[in-house]
Swiss-Prot record:
Organism: Helicobacter pylori (strain ATCC 700392 / 26695)
Residues reported to bind substrate: N76, H82, D89, L103, T104, R113
Name the UniProt record assigns to this protein: 3-dehydroquinate dehydratase
Oligomer status and interactors: Homododecamer.
GO molecular function, one term: 3-dehydroquinate dehydratase activity
Biological process per Gene Ontology, one example term: amino acid biosynthetic process
Keyword flag Cell wall biogenesis/degradation: no
Pathway it works in: Metabolic intermediate biosynthesis; chorismate biosynthesis; chorismate from D-erythrose 4-phosphate and phosphoenolpyruvate: step 3/7
Amino acid sequence: MKILVIQGPNLNMLGHRDPRLYGMVTLDQIHEIMQTFVKQGNLDVELEFFQTNFEGEIIDKIQESVGSDYEGIIINPGAFSHTSIAIADAIMLAGKPVIEVHLTNIQAREEFRKNSYTGAACGGVIMGFGPLGYNMALMAMVNILAEMKAFQEAQKNNPNNPINNQK
């Protein structure tokens, strides 16, 4: 299965940006941790990483995933979580599972950070676990996709499914 990991604004500065909140781990290290998690778990997962500081590029990347071989999206939209109805709309149009990740617990931060337009559009949100949150999202995504495939197989093999009885 192929999973797209989208990283939003300022995440390229992890390791330098407010270490009290975000720690010293860099974005490249987070991606390495995710790849190691895939290898150690013998997961049949291919990850593609994309980072941008531009809202429109995030929307473009989500739209490019429609009809592609990406089966799911893990996204940390950064501060766009709190402002971007456009990214939320793109997530809703993606037609695949999307999980939002935040390194910090946005509910414990400033008042303006507590609302997440994008999180409301996602199937789930994982926040406050630092870099571990990405592996938590990855495990959730793998399980969600496996359940979806099992359901689709069951429907395909169900003789009572009217779609299977069409000639």
